[in-house]
Each structure stands twice: as structure tokens, then as C-alpha cells.
Design a protein with these regions (language model features):
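Conserved HGGG/HGGXW glycine-rich cap/lid loop of the alpha/beta-hydrolase fold
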Residues: 6-58, 72
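Conserved acidic catalytic loop of the alpha/beta-hydrolase fold
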Residues: 63-81
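Active-site micro-motifs of SAM-dependent methyltransferase domains
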Residues: 24, 90, 114-115
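Glycine-centered tight turns that cap/initiate beta-strands
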Residues: 41, 102-103
């Protein structure tokens, strides 16, 4: 693991990991954390290259973000977690669940688009170019 994630944590109980979309950070969930923390140990994570988490040297891909999440859960000694993802956060959650299903309690997905066949080519190219640009800027 070449990065240390920034995160906001509040509450007790089953872990609920909040995963933001591209270009956002953990503060995306600031209005939900208090309510969710009444029943869960809420952890809002800044993914690689977002918010206060450094870019690092590894690939800037959804698969890498899923592997980053595995490393984060291991460091936090969390064996299983509920995952709530918005946009690319939903993509990360889906990828993580596909690779590490034994580590997932529940998935809550909002606006994910892991199957790129439904994305117009022009839009997909813009997304890929933005990721490449972010990689070069780091």
C-alpha cells in the first residue's frame, strides 16, 4: 500500500463505509454521517487522489481503488463492512464486492455505471481523459 487514507469516523456498531464519487471526497456525505452514526460505525473515506488522501504511485483505476479499500479495511481490522457508494463510489463498491464478496455485509449503490457499454463513447473518452490527466498532474 503506497498511500494512507484520510477518513471521517463516527458511531458504533457494524461498519458502514461511505464511498464518494469522482472529483469529490468524504465531505460529500457530511449531511448523512450524523444520522447513519446512530446505528452504524460510519467511516467516510477519501479515495486515492481525492480530498486529503494522496495520489500515490499505483494505478488510478476502479480496480486499484477496490484493492485500496481492502488494504484500508485490513489496517482498520474490519473483517466485514456495509458499503454505500455514490457514482464512482458505487463502482468501487461493486468491484470490491465482486473481488472480495466475503468481506461485504450489504451494498447500497447509487448512480454506479460499472458496465461501460451503457455510456456513450464521447462521455467515456472524457472520463478516461480526466483520469489520465489526473495521473499526469500527480
Amino acid at each position: 500500500m503506497d498511500i494512507k487514507h484520510f477518513y471521517i469516523e463516527k458511531g458504533q456498531g457494524e461498519p458502514l463505509i461511505l464511498l464518494h464519487g469522482n472529483g469529490e471526497d468524504s465531505t460529500y456525505f457530511v449531511n448523512q454521517i450524523d444520522e447513519f452514526s446512530l446505528n452504524y460505525r460510519v467511516i467516510a473515506l477519501d479515495t486515492r487522489g481525492h480530498g486529503q488522501t494522496p495520489r500515490g504511485d499505483s494505478a488510478f483505476t476502479i480496480r486499484q481503488f477496490a484493492d485500496d479499500l481492502l488494504g484500508f479495511l485490513d489496517r482498520m481490522d474490519i473483517q466485514k463492512a456495509n458499503l454505500l457508494g455514490f457514482s464512482d463510489g458505487a463502482n468501487i463498491a461493486m468491484c470490491f464486492a465482486a473481488k472480495y464478496s466475503e468481506r461485504v455485509l450489504k451494498l447500497v449503490l447509487n448512480g454506479g455505471n460499472l458496465d461501460t457499454k451503457g455510456i456513450e463513447e464521447e462521455i467515456q473518452n472524457k472520463i478516461e481523459n480526466a483520469y489520465e490527466s489526473a495521473k499526469m498532474d500527480a
